[in-house]
Amino acid sequence: MLNKIKLQQKRKLIIGWSVFALINLVVILLTVLLRAGLPNLVSKGVTPFSAQAFGDAFIFLITRVYLDNFLRQPALLLGVITLIGYLALGRGGVQSVVGALKTVIGFILLSIGSGVLVSTARPVFDTIKGLGGTGVVLLDPYFSLASANDFFTNSFLNNDYVSLIAFSLLVGFIVNIIFVGLKRWTNTNSIMVTGHVMLQQAAVVTTLFYIVLFRQIPLLGTGIAYGAQAGLVIISGIFLGVYWSTASTGTYLVTNKVTNNAGFSIGHQQMLGIMTVAKLGKYFGDKNDSAEHKKLPKALKIFEDNIFTQTIIILSLFVVLFIVILASYKGDKPLLINWDKFGAINGLEIWNTTFGGANFTLNIIGGALKMVASLIAIMTGVRMFITELQQAFQGISEKVVPGAVVAVDIAAVYGFSINSVTFGFLSGVIGQFLAVAIMAGISYIPGNQFSFVAIPLFITLFFNSGAFGVYANAEGGWKAALLLPGIIGFLEIIVISFALRTVSNAYQASALLDAKQSFDLKALMGNSLDNNNGSALKTAVEKVVNATGVNRITEAQSFVKSDSFNSLKAVNSTLAQAIEWISKSASPVDNGFIGMADWNLYFGLLVWIGAYNVIGGWILVILATVGLILLAQIIDNGKQTKVTKLQQLLKINPQLDLNN
């Protein structure tokens, strides 16, 4: 029977790969033969089936068919990765295609939710910044993912680089597998399979490394140079792979303590934080005096409901932000029209559409609910395609590195220590919002250009501070669970509020913004507005065209919010598109950041210092990567049976498991 099953799997594997190869062969033949046989449809004067025709055909195949229509399309790219993974596992053609289809649809759902989230939240943040205060950044991994997608989609005229995130994820996963495969040297034994977390982290690392490491490389036209794209993917992937290998391995032993030897590690946003809490817990209390022995009030249980708590936090936050806007706005245009609807200020009029003809007060509530709904859409889309991608990744890793430990979502440990989660959550809320209050006060320092106000949302608070409660309790009892999450949360907000502003400032000195400030708008305008001599439209357009430096971006932002923008679309859509591109000057952190311990504290310190100078940034990223490799040598991974070569070289004496 077993041999029969293996034979069926081999048959499915052969059939699946044959179909995949056949499809690619048909695409290549049709593209090359049609393009070489009918070259005059594109380029006049080229002889059909000549050497030049075939050369043009192959360039078209690579750049347009595979690069632009596949490798730069993240939904299709991830779908094909799932397809290949399932085929490698012998799932058969039908199941592989269904898995790929779910992946594509899930990513499209993510994109829809991201678009709604960013378009709803951004006008509020832009208006807050326009009041003269510092910016507000929401700490939430899905806001962060949406912000990164928006940056790579809209920052480069007619170029979409979201697929770079997927490439970084793929390289990182390969590096993770290689490191675990070389565990005799690396001392790492854990493979990340939490795809949604990996995607969020790949988005943050890829976008921020572009700003920190590649911001001064001149653009190729209005796009990222090919060498910079390759370098960005490689350095991001290596950093991610080393981080995933080391940090997840470091959670294995203490997770076994929490779960009574369940045999998995954690693959989430706070793995280094978990290691830190586990080491510090014993200094704050007695692990035998556990939080699980305490009785909690029933009223606190309501905060375990994800949707309820997200709604309360987001609604409260945006009500406060709108109160600040209403109390402080002093612009020329009316903010409110007849105390009923928002005026055309920074795009705030989008909030009028939530409940149709309702008053602005109801639309504020509706807008907050709309953002919660978009977050749910993002999470649903992510779960949909990650479920498929995760199975493909896990299956591949099991075949390549048998016996490796799987790193799973942090929620897997919550059932083992429910009270500790609540202790950590409440402690984190107090500590982080105390830091928010301090950063809000700092934001009122005149001329503040050195800090943002980072505000944590539910996912950050519950899955970051709640996790710390669990691991602090395991080593230091209820006192550690009640104190450590708040202390670490406080430090997180302080560090990341300064770090994100530094990154945003670095973006303002990037080659991308230089390209926007020097883009030849006059050539695009040409004579298209000659029939509008003396008109308000031509005057408004010329203000943008003739502006220089930062003033051009400011003028472009004002222009796209005016009625003249729609008029220009009808006359010269190419010029209108270019001006709209110039107006979009948000850095990849302005609309959201991942917001959990490893990224607020450790990665936050890295980019805070590294963003000041590109060379310094490269040095720090390399040192951080090497540091993670060395950190793996002193980690007790719980399954080590022999001393590694690096441990011998560094004279480290690890704890060996002689029973394996």
Swiss-Prot record:
Keywords: Cell membrane, Membrane, Phosphotransferase system, Sugar transport, Transmembrane, Transmembrane helix, Transport. It is a multi-pass membrane protein. L-ascorbate binds at residues 141-142, 196-200, 268-269, 409. It holds the Pfam family EIIC-GAT. It comes from the Bacteria. InterPro entries: Ascorbate-PTS_EIIC, PTS_sugar-sp_permease. Its main location: membrane. The keyword Cell membrane applies. The chain crosses the membrane at residues 14-34, 74-94, 98-118, 162-182, 194-214, 224-244, 307-327, 362-382, 401-421, 422-442, 450-470, 592-612, 615-635. One of its GO terms (cellular component) is plasma membrane. It is found in: Cell membrane. One of its GO terms (biological process) is phosphoenolpyruvate-dependent sugar phosphotransferase system. The keyword Disulfide bond does not apply. Belongs to the UlaA family. The phosphoenolpyruvate-dependent sugar phosphotransferase system (sugar PTS), a major carbohydrate active transport system, catalyzes the phosphorylation of incoming sugar substrates concomitantly with their translocation across the cell membrane. The enzyme II UlaABC PTS system is involved in ascorbate transport. Homodimer. In classical PTS systems, the PTS EIIC type-2 domain forms the translocation channel and contains the specific substrate-binding site. UlaA does not exhibit the topological features of any recognized enzyme IIC. This is Ascorbate-specific PTS system EIIC component. It comes from Mycoplasma pneumoniae (strain ATCC 29342 / M129 / Subtype 1). The lineage of its organism: Bacteria, Bacillati, Mycoplasmatota, Mycoplasmoidales, Mycoplasmoidaceae.
